[in-house]
Swiss-Prot record:
GO molecular function, one term: ureidoglycolate hydrolase activity
Known function: Catalyzes the catabolism of the allantoin degradation intermediate (S)-ureidoglycolate, generating urea and glyoxylate. Involved in the utilization of allantoin as nitrogen source.
Protein name: Ureidoglycolate lyase
GO BP terms, alphabetized: allantoin catabolic process; purine nucleobase catabolic process
Catalysed conversion reaction: (S)-ureidoglycolate = urea + glyoxylate
Pathway: Nitrogen metabolism; (S)-allantoin degradation
Entry similarity comment: Belongs to the ureidoglycolate lyase family.
CDD domains: cupin_UAH
Cofactors, names only: Ni(2+)
Claim: Kinase is one of the keywords in the record: no
Keywords: Lyase, Purine metabolism
Subunit structure: Homodimer.
Length: 167
């Protein structure tokens, strides 16, 4: 099994998979009579059907034991999905490029600094939310509508990966 190298999350490195939601280096302008800085259009919500709705939820995720064996990835073919950390804690992101199935050799891992969120583009393969050391809350923006919006792929045993953030 290959151990994933965990990369710092950056807009450039994550671009094939989606958007990094952060204020650093982002376009902004003043609003509210100069009392508020608006960081504009940090990500775009994607939905497949005109009747779909963009929705906002909170996910409360428990930390998983590390090192973690990556046995599966999922994707949302009908809409994007954004995770914005609410408690300021770093979290892990595991992704693979678009395709009919994820390719184990192309899987990448990133770590958010806790002030960065991410928006997976529609159809991007990813692991479910991964907190590092404790329960964490995330603001989630995704779509609600008809149709199956979650495909799962389970890797064969020899394709599985190891995620070890403390090594």
């Amino acid at each position: 099994m290959r151990t994933l190298v965990i990369e710092p999350l950056s807009k450039e490195a994550f671009a094939p998979f989606g958007d990094v939601i952060e204020t650093d280096g982002s376009d902004h302008f003043m609003i509210n009579n100069g009392s508020t800085m608006r960081f504009h259009r940090l990500a775009t919500v994607e939905t497949a059907q005109p009747e779909d709705q963009a929705i906002i939820s909170i996910f409360r995720a428990d930390a998983l034991d590390m090192p973690l064996t990556i046995r599966m990835l999922e994707r949302h073919p009908l809409g994007s999905q954004a995770f914005i950390p609410l408690l300021g804690n770093p979290f892990l992101i595991v992704v693979a490029p678009l395709g009919d199935e994820p390719v184990s050799g192309l899987v990448r891992a990133f770590v958010s600094n806790g002030r960065q969120g991410i928006n997976y583009h529609r159809g991007v393969w990813h692991h479910p939310v991964l907190t590092i050391e404790k329960r964490d809350d995330f603001l989630v923006v995704d779509r609600s509508g008809t149709g199956n919006n979650c495909d799962e792929h389970f890797f064969k045993e020899d394709e599985r990966l190891i995620l070890a953030p403390h090594q």
